[in-house]
């Protein structure tokens, strides 16, 4: 039971850190390379 409580307390922390870093990475990619879904007609 103690291991289950440890797992349930660690999993939200790790998922919050993971999704937070993923969101920051996506924000920085979109800041450096804006409009990734549109194809430029000329470079």
UniProtKB/Swiss-Prot annotation:
Pfam families assigned: PSI_PsaJ
SUPFAM superfamilies: Subunit IX of photosystem I reaction centre, PsaJ
Record's GO cellular component terms: chloroplast thylakoid membrane; photosystem I
GO biological process, one term: photosynthesis
Primary localization: plastid
Compartments, as annotated in UniProt: Plastid, Chloroplast thylakoid membrane
Keywords, comma-separated and alphabetical: Chloroplast, Membrane, Photosynthesis, Photosystem I, Plastid, Thylakoid, Transmembrane, Transmembrane helix
InterPro entries membership: PSI_PsaJ (IPR002615), PSI_PsaJ_sf (IPR036062)
Segments crossing the lipid bilayer: 7-27
Topology of this chain in the membrane: Single-pass membrane protein
Protein purpose: May help in the organization of the PsaE and PsaF subunits.
Similarity comment: family membership: Belongs to the PsaJ family.
Listed HAMAP family: PSI_PsaJ
Protein's recorded name: Photosystem I reaction center subunit IX
Taxon lineage: Eukaryota, Viridiplantae, Streptophyta, Embryophyta, Tracheophyta
